[in-house]
Amino acid sequence: RSSDLYVVKREINFHIPFGEQAITYSPKSFAGSRHVIRARLALPEEIAARRNLAFNCYDEHGDTGFYPHASANVETRGEAVFAARNAIDGIFENSAHGEYPYQSWGINRDPGAALTLDFGREVLLDELRITERADFPHDNYWVKATVEFSDGSTLDIPLVKSAKPQRVTFEPKRVRSLVLKDLIQAEGTSPFPALTQIEAFGTEVK
């Protein structure tokens, strides 16, 4: 798989996951004895294209030196299958939860949970898409979320019970980061809403 990355350091590292950290990747990802990793500079037309600026299947915890990067103030039990990075890995399978391909961002039942998406530079956003985990009846779902942008503006997003991406568009905003917060879950018996993917569509600042 490939992602468009914004690199701010002269050197970047991707740490090969082992054990519990590996179960959010395909079991075939690091199998066998031959592997290839390849990187190249993006073409001008690729840089100029409107795209999902949140997608990064190589994201990890900590200061990676490349963007986009997802982090959160809470992740369920600190487990890899519920880490913030799962919400930008480009995998939309959401009819179950746990190991690949059903990883998600889990909020550990915390009403104050918030996810930060850092683009590493200013970008021009005009659309967000939220895909909630939909492992019903195990899961609950959110009926409202708030996004706070780095320019100080906020956006309330109404949500419904759905396995599909839920889309909201707005006038282009020049931002470096955003925070998904104030997650209001539906009334019900399940205390387990979760996020499968957040997408942020837009372009580079010209």
Predicted regions and their residues:
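Disordered, acidic Ser/Thr/Pro-rich linker "stalks" and the adjacent N-terminal cap
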Residues: N13-A114, D118, P137-N140
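Long, low-complexity intrinsically disordered regions enriched in Ser/Thr, Asp/Glu, Pro/Gly
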Residues: R1-F18
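Aromatic, loop-rich ligand-recognition surfaces of beta-strand-rich domains
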Residues: R1-D4, F92-L155, L159, K164, ...
